[in-house]
Amino acid sequence: IEVNKVCYMLSELVEQLPRNVRRGKIYFSIMHHPANSVRNEASVSIGYPFSSKSNPYARVGTDSFDFDSGVQMDADPSWAWLRNPAHHDRLIDMMKRGNQLVFKGTSARGTLTTDTYSLLGFSKALARLNQACPPV
C-alpha cells in the first residue's frame, strides 16, 4: 500500500440556486484513502463559509443524508462531510441508481443554497476510482 495514496472523484454542479450569489469552488467528492481504511467518504465544497446553524444535507431520489459542516467540526468552514460514516455505502448505492443529487446548505450570511449535480456517469467514474485505489 502506498501510505499516502488518496484517490478521489469530483463532480461539478449543473445548477445552483440562487444564481446571483458569488461563491468559490463548488463540487461534490467521493474519496478513498486505503491506508486509513477510508472508502466512499462523501464531502462537498460549497464555495462559502457555512452558518454555524446550517443543517446541510444531500438528497438522492427520496432519500436524504445529513452532513456536518466544517464550522460544526472545527475544520474548513466551506466544506461538509456526511455525518454518519455508516451511511457512506447507502449514499453510494443511491448515487449509482439515481439521476441527480441535490445539496442544500446555508451560508454564514443566511443564504440558503440549492446545488444540483448530475449522476450521469457516476457508476463508471466510481469503478475507475475503485480500480485506482482498491480495498486492502
Give, region by region, the residue ranges found by the protein language model.
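A generic "folded-domain core" signal
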Residues: 1-136
